[in-house]
Curated annotation (Swiss-Prot):
Organism: Xenopus laevis (African clawed frog)
Gene: cdk8
The protein, known as: Cyclin-dependent kinase 8
Catalytic activity field: L-seryl-[protein] + ATP = O-phospho-L-seryl-[protein] + ADP + H(+); L-threonyl-[protein] + ATP = O-phospho-L-threonyl-[protein] + ADP + H(+); [DNA-directed RNA polymerase] + ATP = phospho-[DNA-directed RNA polymerase] + ADP + H(+)
Residue ranges of domain Protein kinase in the record: 21-287
Necessary cofactors: Mg(2+)
EC number: 2.7.11.22, 2.7.11.23
Subunit-level organization: Component of the Mediator complex. Interacts with ccnc.
Length: 416
């Protein structure tokens, strides 16, 4: 390459440090790298962005896969990759995303903590339903375009804060995602282990030699149902003697003849062939009764969840989850199936980490179908419009409220 042209090209290349202010605003850390909350220096807009710096030099296979998929995938419930920056000086890769203030892991953690403090904050049923519906919508879009996410868990389900996309769910972290072009895919052709341990579908735990997109779409949906926060300990028990869904649901006041119970039964079916798909789940009667799902999961309510805190250079991403991570790593070591390392939800750190793959996967063929938006083509994908939301200035606690008188979160247990 001509030297003068190379110098000119280097001078014209956009550098992330020239465009964004992010120093001291780290909100996430893992073996994948670091995530910063950033703003434009030129003041062209007031939006918050998430800058993800890939760890190491060059581009790993995981980063390549994530970039390639996110450049093609366009859906309201899938995280949007705005731009990729390559720093030739230090060979760093930066990914620019929309910033999501919350994620499902921290939402669940907030409610579990409030319950432990004897001041439970009840989730409105409408919020739970909207969360679940939007997650299913995003998963269906991925599967309709022949993409398996393979690492769905609460930490990878982002929720937008105040702004144009308030309350919008975003599925993040495509580092483990794969294209597929056949009903069954041998496990040996890809990774020996997929999906974080606690969120694996039963067929993976039982040693299935093949898996379908059923591992990706429905078993994890139990975590988005209202009963998840109280059921988490039950699902971690080592023994399931005389176990039945009805026995567990009874103590959480879920009636066996309710639409909620029937949907849970269909989502938790052990046989992946009989388990309902994300599209079928979206058409379930549960979503057709009031309150209807909305595009803003916080519609009519305040947002009680604290904003993301900035981390220091030495501070771990999630101090409260060290014990869980150590326990997870111990289980993985015992079973010989774990891969601690990179857990990337584009913004924040959740439960056990996963390792970045450095061995190229087996080549697969097949393309992405991007010709239509699922929401426009499927009448069941339409959300109820919650109406315009006029936000007031934030309070000193960092929460926001609507101008109307919505149902308030309180420290009392209410029925919604």
């Amino acid at each position: 390459m001509d030297y003068d042209f190379k110098v000119k090209l280097t001078g014209e290349r956009e550098r992330v440090e020239d465009l964004f202010e992010y120093e001291g605003c780290k909100v996430g850390r893992g073996t994948y790298g670091h995530v910063y909350k950033a703003k434009r220096k030129d003041g062209k807009d007031d939006r918050d962005y998430a800058l993800k710096q890939i760890e190491g030099t060059g581009i790993s296979m995981s980063a390549c896969r994530e970039i390639a998929l996110l450049r093609e995938l366009k859906h309201p419930n899938v995280i949007s990759l705005q731009k990729v920056f390559l720093s030739h000086a230090d060979r760093k890769v930066w990914l620019l995303f929309d910033f999501a203030e919350h994620d499902l892991w921290h939402i669940i953690k907030f409610h579990r903590a409030s319950k432990a403090n004897k001041k439970p904050v009840q989730l409105p049923r409408g919020m739970v339903k909207s969360l679940l519906y939007q997650i299913l919508d995003g998963i269906h879009y991925l599967h309709a375009n022949w993409v398996l996410h393979r690492d769905l868990k609460p930490a990878n389900i982002l929720v937008m804060g105040e702004g144009p996309e308030r309350g919008r769910v975003k599925i993040a972290d495509m580092g483990f995602a794969r294209l597929f072009n056949s009903p069954l895919k041998p496990l040996a052709d890809l990774d020996p282990v997929v999906v974080t341990f606690w969120y694996r579908a039963p067929e993976l735990l039982l040693g299935a030699r093949h898996y379908t997109k059923a591992i990706d779409k429905d078993w994890e949906d139990i975590k988005k149902m209202p009963e998840h926060s109280t059921l988490i300990k039950d699902f971690r028990r080592n023994t399931y003697t005389n176990c039945s869904l009805i026995k567990y649901m009874e103590k959480h006041k879920v009636k066996p003849d309710s639409k909620t119970f029937h949907l849970l039964q269909k989502l938790l079916t052990m046989d992946p062939i009989k388990r309902i798909s994300s599209e079928q789940a979206m058409q379930d009667p549960y979503f057709l009764e009031d309150p209807l799902p909305t595009s803003d999961v916080f519609a009519g309510c305040q947002i009680p969840y604290p904003k993301r805190e900035f981390l220091t250079e030495e501070e771990p991403d999630d101090k409260g989850d060290k014990k869980n991570q150590q326990q997870q790593q111990g289980n993985n070591h015992t079973n010989g199936t774990g891969h601690p390392g990179n857990q990337d939800n584009s913004h924040a750190q959740g439960p056990p980490l996963k390792k970045v793959r450095v061995v190229p996967p087996t080549t697969t063929s097949g393309g992405l179908i991007m010709t239509s938006d699922y929401q426009r083509s499927n009448p069941h994908a339409a959300y109820q419009n919650p109406g315009p939301s006029t936000s007031q200035p934030q309070s000193s606690m960092g929460y926001t409220s609507t101008s109307q008188q919505p149902p308030q979160y309180s420290h009392q247990t209410h029925r919604y």
